[in-house]
């Protein structure tokens, strides 16, 4: 019997087999790669043992989905620039410069990849290529269609050779090295069997405990602020940089109401007699300010917190830069995650190396998540509100004349921040016995309140912390809210919001206790039916075309979440799958994690805080109302936090080189000064928690967040699916007819609140709409993207008339963060305004007018296009489900292959009965694959 023919993948730039390539074909492939290059690769050696090699591309730029082409370009950089320069042990990281919505963004793609073994012997090129392709494939999923403007390699080695003196390979040698790597990679990639690693014993707590820690209420803290002007650092610079010209601080005593007389201010121009250059004046001002704060702390003998409002995105970058350069004998410890600065700790270091914490810089915005002007209205309206000041027209020459006005503005900001934090701290301590100086974010505060006051970790309530494998699977079923445009234009509409959608969804039954894996949910042997499942299920889904507004989300290759009809595989919360069946979906469970279904442990938390919030609102206590609102809304998302995090350290150049070579989680390193580097390393959760013992665990329980968002989508669907629904955004709907009276209440938890009567509305894309509401004079405009200042009423009207229209605009990014140099800059950028129908397809009338949308339809695939894993799953389902075979009856290849598989199974069974092994050739090779 001849084995069935193996399918081969389509030969294109992303999927190509190399072992049979002639030199001519290979050179043609490389020629296509080189067409994208803009000039020769650049390189720089910032310090001994560190090399950066860059290859710029030109238009048309390659897409991030062109994995093979980009992997080849990375390999050329390694072969021609990195390998000739390294000595001893070496590692490297990969970077993209991506163009996302008109904004160039630098992304480090992975932690450091080893180039050599421990003894300095080079790892074979094909294995390096394999690592590169694995990394690029992961990013291709989310950035498939984004332009790659440049790639770069950062190499770290024990020693280095000047490239001017190194032995650079000739063109022919380079081609041979690259071709050899590609051919050998192709071989090992086809033959290698994936490793099924054993689960290691967990080394961290398996459930979220009650918080029983004793807490003292610190009575003193600081608030501070900086004002900046824009200045070019060098005459050759294109972009201007924010440079502090004024600063101030205030010590807040919880036993005394804030007083503007206690604010100390500093002004850069005051140092013009001792400094000639403005940058020196600014640095002198910051030195005086920080030194004064440190002296105030030392007089009291214990460390203190300094709050800046928006430290994470603005002030913190300048503070970190200043401390690094000016406090060389101190230890600086920032806590950063995804380029967000959560805190900066300043330690004094004694002669014997002991560290003593002096200051912790923290961000009040991360705790309260609202602009200062709005906080002033809620917490301290008696102070007169936030002032106004023309920041754009501040120049060095004007500083003497605007001194009084700028310091008045600065002092008002400091006074408001002090009053807000004083009041918020008092409320949280009085209500819950928690000192907010001990927490960094509002979500961390909400979790601490829940664990301290409302949670019982007994058998009926304990929330399990999934291990890495469990969390990774469940996270596939963690989707956000449902946001879609259904009809682009409507008149006389009703806009409704749900009162606290996610908190109300937290009242439903929750996945509690330890999970258990079931691998054969789709098998006839499995006695579990869908209605008995409670957990997160991988399933094969069929959504009929007649469903106009589908329920179940699906993640596309570019990361876009759509709600399609058709056939697809995904991981979903079991309750969504049950509801989908009631709508007409066909659901074929395959495998999943099953939990105990228990009454929600969040009921006391939600009901109590919501009741207190209504009471505060009725009494006009805006500050209390605000605290209750953000606390209640922030808890569910905290459980979904990714346990994978990064640690950023400021270390010596020598320590940076050691981390680059020997830390497996090394990501990147930036040189801050001649002897200091900013190093980022990725933490492995279990090892990280082991080091930190149990005092700082990552309480991540993604099953809670995924269940809450699943319940929320179920709650919204009956209203979304109405034929008169024009638009939805997570917890809101815009409809033509009023909702039933029993569904509407201005205060009831989980009910809809009528926000606006809409005279007319234009809905162009998710989070991009314009409403003319009867309750307000000006149109309500929402626009997601850099061009929001250009998105006026006229633009919406013109775009509705021609949804394919594009408009390139220039705009100013006022606060562009540059972590490589620790700067905040103002940059001129370009942005293409227009619509791109990614979530639903446009429907036009006979005159070409956009009048409606319809869901994307996916999954009417040719069997040859299915990836091997999906193919194998579907073949097994066909064996178990006759109705699914009927569904695929029009796919002759699929049914034929199923019949071959069934026939092979019969032969195998008969062979076993005869006691003879089945010959390998009797099983189709593509099924083995």
Swiss-Prot record:
| Region called Disordered, residue ranges | 907-929
One biological-process term from Gene Ontology? DNA replication
Predominant subcellular localization, coarse grouping: mitochondrion
**Chain intervals with Basic residues compositional bias:** 907-917
Q: Is Transferase among the key words of this record?
A: yes
Show the Pfam families listed in the entry: DNA_pol_B_2
Locations listed in the record: Mitochondrion
Which top-level group of life is the source organism from?
A: Eukaryota
Gene Ontology cellular component annotations, sorted alphabetically:
mitochondrion
Alphabetically sorted, this entry's keywords are: DNA replication, DNA-binding, DNA-directed DNA polymerase, Mitochondrion, Nucleotidyltransferase, Plasmid, Transferase
Reactions that this protein is recorded to catalyse: DNA(n) + a 2'-deoxyribonucleoside 5'-triphosphate = DNA(n+1) + diphosphate
Q: Which InterPro entries match?
A: DNA-dir_DNA_pol_B (IPR006172), DNA-dir_DNA_pol_B_CS (IPR017964), DNA-dir_DNA_pol_B_mt/vir (IPR004868), DNA-dir_DNA_pol_B_mt_lin_plsmd (IPR015833), DNA/RNA_pol_sf (IPR043502), DNA_pol_palm_dom_sf (IPR023211), RNaseH-like_sf (IPR012337), RNaseH_sf (IPR036397)
Molecular function GO terms recorded? DNA binding; DNA-directed DNA polymerase activity; nucleotide binding
- List the EC numbers from the record: 2.7.7.7
Please give the family membership noted in the entry: Belongs to the DNA polymerase type-B family.
Q: Note on file?
A: This DNA polymerase requires a protein as a primer. These complexes consist of double-stranded linear DNAs with proteins covalently attached to the 5'-termini.
Protein's name in the database: DNA polymerase
């Amino acid at each position: 019997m001849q084995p069935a023919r193996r399918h081969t993948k389509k030969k294109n730039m992303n999927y190509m087999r190399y072992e049979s390539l002639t030199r001519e074909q290979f050179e043609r492939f490389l020629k296509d790669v080189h067409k994208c290059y803009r000039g020769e690769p650049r390189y720089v050696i910032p310090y001994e043992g560190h090399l950066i090699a860059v290859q710029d591309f030109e238009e048309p730029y390659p897409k991030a989905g062109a994995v093979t082409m980009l992997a080849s370009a990375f390999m050329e950089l390694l072969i021609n620039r990195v390998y000739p320069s390294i000595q001893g042990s070496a590692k490297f990281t990969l970077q993209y410069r991506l163009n996302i919505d008109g904004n160039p963004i630098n992304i480090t793609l992975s932690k450091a990849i080893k180039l050599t073994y421990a003894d300095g012997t080079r790892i074979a090129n094909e294995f390096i290529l394999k690592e590169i392709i694995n990394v690029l494939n992961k990013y291709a999923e989310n950035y498939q269609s984004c332009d790659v403007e440049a790639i770069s390699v950062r190499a770290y080695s024990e020693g280095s050779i000047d490239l001017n003196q190194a032995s650079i390979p000739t063109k022919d040698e380079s081609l041979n090295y690259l071709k050899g790597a590609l051919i050998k990679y192709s071989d090992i990639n086809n033959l290698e069997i994936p490793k099924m690693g054993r689960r290691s014993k967990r080394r961290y707590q398996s459930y979220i405990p009650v918080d029983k820690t004793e807490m003292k209420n610190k009575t003193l803290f600081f608030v501070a602020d900086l004002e900046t002007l824009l200045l070019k650092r060098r005459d050759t610079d294109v972009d201007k940089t924010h440079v502090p010209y004024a600063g101030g601080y205030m010590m807040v005593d919880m036993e005394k109401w804030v007083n503007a007389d206690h604010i100390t201010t500093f002004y850069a121009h005051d140092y013009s007699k001792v400094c000639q250059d403005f940058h020196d004046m600014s640095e002198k001002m910051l030195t005086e300010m920080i030194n004064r704060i440190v002296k105030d702390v030392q007089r009291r003998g214990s460390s203190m917190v300094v709050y800046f409002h928006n430290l994470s995105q603005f002030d913190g970058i300048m503070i970190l830069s200043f401390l690094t350069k000016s406090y060389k004998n101190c230890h600086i410890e920032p806590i950063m995650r995804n380029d967000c600065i959560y805190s900066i700790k300043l330690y004094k270091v004694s002669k014997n190396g002991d560290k003593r914490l002096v200051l912790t810089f923290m961000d009040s915005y991360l705790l309260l998540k609202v602009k200062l002007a709005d906080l002033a209205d809620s917490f301290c309206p008696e102070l007169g509100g936030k002032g106004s000041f023309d920041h754009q027209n501040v120049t060095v020459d004007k500083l003497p004349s605007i001194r009084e006005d700028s310091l008045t503005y600065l002092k008002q900001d400091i006074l408001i921040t002090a009053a807000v934090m004083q009041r918020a701290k008092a409320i949280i301590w009085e209500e819950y016995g928690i000192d907010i100086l001990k927490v960094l974010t509002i979500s961390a505060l909400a979790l601490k309140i829940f664990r301290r006051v409302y949670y019982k970790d007994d058998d009926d309530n304990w929330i399990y912390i999934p291990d890495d494998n469990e969390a990774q699977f469940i996270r596939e079923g963690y989707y956000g809210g449902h946001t879609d445009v259904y009809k682009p234009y409507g008149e006389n509409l009703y806009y409704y919001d749900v009162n606290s959608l996610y908190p109300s969804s937290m009242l439903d039954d929750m996945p509690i206790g330890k999970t258990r894996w079931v691998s054969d949910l789709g098998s006839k042997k499995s006695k579990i039916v869908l209605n008995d499942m409670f957990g997160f299920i991988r399933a094969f889904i069929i959504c009929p075309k007649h469903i106009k507004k589908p329920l179940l989300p699906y993640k596309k290759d570019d990361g876009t979440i759509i709600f399609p009809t058709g056939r697809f595989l995904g991981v979903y919360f079991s309750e969504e799958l049950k509801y989908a069946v009631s709508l007409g979906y066909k659901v074929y469970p395959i495998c999943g994690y099953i939990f105990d279904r228990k009454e929600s442990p969040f009921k006391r938390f939600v009901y109590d805080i919501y009741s207190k919030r209504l009471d505060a609102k009725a009494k006009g206590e805006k500050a209390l109302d605000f605290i209750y609102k953000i606390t209640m809304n922030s808890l569910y998302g905290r459980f979904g936090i990714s346990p994978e995090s990064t640690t950023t350290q400021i270390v010596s150049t020598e320590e940076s080189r050691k981390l680059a070579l020997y830390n497996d989680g090394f990501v990147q390193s930036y040189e801050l000064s001649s002897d200091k580097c900013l190093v980022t390393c990725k933490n492995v959760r279990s090892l990280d928690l082991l080091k930190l013992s149990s005092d700082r665990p990552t309480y991540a329980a993604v099953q809670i967040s995924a269940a809450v968002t699943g319940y929320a989508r179920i709650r919204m669907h009956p209203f979304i699916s109405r034929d008169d629904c024009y638009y939805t955004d997570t917890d809101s709907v815009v409809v033509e007819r009023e909702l039933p009276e029993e569904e509407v209440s201005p205060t009831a938890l989980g009910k809809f609140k009528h926000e606006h009567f809409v005279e007319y509305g234009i809905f162009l894309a998710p989070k991009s709409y314009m409403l003319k509401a009867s309750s307000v004079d000006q149109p309500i405009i929402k626009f997601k993207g850099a061009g929001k200042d250009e998105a006026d009423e006229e633009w919406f009207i013109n775009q509705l008339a021609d949804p394919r229209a594009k408009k390139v605009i220039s705009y100013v990014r006022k606060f562009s963060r540059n972590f490589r140099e620790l700067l905040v800059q103002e940059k001129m950028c370009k942005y293409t305004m227009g619509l791109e129908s990614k979530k639903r397809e446009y429907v036009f009338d006979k005159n070409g007018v956009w009048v409606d949308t319809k869901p994307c339809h996916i999954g009417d695939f040719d069997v040859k296009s299915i990836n091997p894993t999906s193919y194998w799953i579907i073949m097994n389902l066909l064996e178990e489900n006759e109705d699914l075979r009927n569904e695929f009856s029009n796919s002759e290849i699929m049914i034929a292959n199923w019949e071959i598989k069934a026939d092979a199974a019969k032969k195998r069974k008969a062979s076993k009965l005869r006691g003879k092994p089945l010959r390998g050739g009797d099983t189709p090779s593509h099924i083995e694959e």
